[in-house]
Amino acid sequence: MAKLYLTFLGTLLTCVLAFSQHKPDQKNASKDSTETANEYMHRSHTDDLIERFESPERDAYQKPEKVLDYLGNVLNKKIMDIGAGSGYFSVKLADRGAKVIAADVSDEFQNALKKRIEVQGIKNIELRKIPYDDPNLHDHEVDIALIVNTYHHIEDRSTYFSKVKKGTKGKGELVIIDFFKTEVPVGPPTGHKISIDQVIAELKEAGYSQFEVNVDLLPYQYIIKAK
């Protein structure tokens, strides 16, 4: 399957978010039905999560340079990285000349990223602590809202992404990267994953009407561009 392009008419879509890059925990698979994605992730210490997020093993399947190429020219574009975590994509976007808002609900992640920015002398990343239920975007603030491995952490997604849409410029887009809803070697338990069809249905409720879906670029994840 190359890319599929789907266009829909849509109307309207409160939230919990955090950030994941976990290998499935088979010993605790029985908890999948009751444990939330956020509870599952917070079994791990922040330092362990950062090490995992920034690992060569992640690079191998996340293919960040291919993802950035897929996003196109980001020079001088304002991009919010929702669930920025350790800054995995935020730093790479900044390296390509984007003006990045690295947004996260976690003080630990924000503090770690602040130190990284200072050490590396990065000038084009703004840290933004956000609440669980709001991306804290100003109207028409960004060209791109990027959310990687975090969509499945958000609970009231229709409401949350209607706010994201309001914060995106007229010709801007939302880009979602998350795990296929199947058994793969990385990511959260299958019960925490969200299917492509469900994502599109929820985004339609949030007011999005144009979708580009790529299932070939990454081995374990889909990419959805929405406007």
Language-model-detected regions and their locations in the chain:
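A short glycine-rich, Lys/Arg-flanked "PGG" loop and its adjoining helix->strand segment in the class I
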Residues: 158-173
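Class I SAM-dependent methyltransferase SAM/SAH-binding core
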Residues: 80-134
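A short SAM/SAH-binding and catalytic strip from SAM-dependent methyltransferases
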Residues: 143-157
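Conserved class I S-adenosyl-L-methionine
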Residues: 175-200
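Bacterial Sec-dependent N-terminal signal peptides
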Residues: 1-24
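Class I SAM-dependent transferase core
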Residues: 22-72
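Core SAM-dependent methyltransferase catalytic element
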Residues: 212-227
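A short acidic, Gly/Pro-enriched loop at the edge of an enzyme's catalytic core
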Residues: 135-144
